[in-house]
């Protein structure tokens, strides 16, 4: 996991648009800036990505009906328990039309302990980021700029990282 974060940090300083050896990872040629990136927590409180500048941010888009999302979520959860990653903020954002209870059950069934549930309502981020499938994970540098994304599932605990 530590190698994953080091790799991602190195990528945040890279401007080469390419798919690397890591399955489904696309590195942006140029950093992408977005305005008004907001999402909701489980209490329907609005959060803004700008409030997390100074941190490396991961937005992971998922849904309860998505089998690859179910496979990926436990390894994403492991990133949240690493004490060496203080400046990493992970926001798993449900883009399905699921109820809070269904999302909580999904996390409980997978024994997710280090992540909280967030929602994209009403799917504005899915459109803004032009998501092509689930799961999709988008990486933002400390300036709040997108530098890479993973389209599809990945094992965040894989030794490649």
Segments from the language model and where they lie:
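Thiol/disulfide oxidoreductase modules built on the thioredoxin-like
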Residues: 109-113, 120-161
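Structural microenvironment flanking redox-active thiols in thiol-disulfide oxidoreductases
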Residues: 70-110, 121-127
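Active-site acidic short loop of glycosyltransferases
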Residues: 52-55, 85, 112-114, 131
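Sec-dependent N-terminal signal peptides
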Residues: 3-12
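N-terminal "domain-start" segment that seeds a small globular fold
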Residues: 17-49
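Short active-site neighborhood of thiol/selenol oxidoreductases, capturing the structured segment around
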Residues: 48-70
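Hydrophobic beta-strand anchors of alpha/beta hydrolase catalytic cores
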Residues: 58-59, 90, 137
């Amino acid at each position: 996991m530590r190698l994953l974060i080091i790799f991602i940090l190195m990528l945040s300083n890279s401007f080469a648009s390419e798919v690397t050896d890591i399955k489904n990872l696309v590195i942006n040629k140029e950093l992408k800036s977005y305005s008004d990136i907001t999402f909701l927590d489980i209490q329907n409180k609005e959060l803004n990505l700008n409030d997390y500048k100074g941190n490396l941010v991961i937005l992971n888009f998922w849904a309860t009906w998505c089998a690859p999302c179910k496979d990926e979520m436990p390894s994403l959860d492991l990133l949240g328990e690493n004490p060496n990653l203080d400046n990493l903020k992970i926001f798993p954002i449900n883009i399905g039309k699921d109820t809070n209870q269904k999302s909580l059950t999904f996390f409980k069934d997978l024994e997710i302990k280090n992540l909280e549930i967030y929602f994209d309502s009403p799917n504005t981020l899915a459109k803004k980021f032009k998501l092509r499938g689930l799961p999709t994970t988008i990486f933002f540098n400390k300036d709040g700029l997108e530098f890479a994304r993973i389209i599809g599932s990945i094992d965040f605990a894989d030794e490649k990282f």
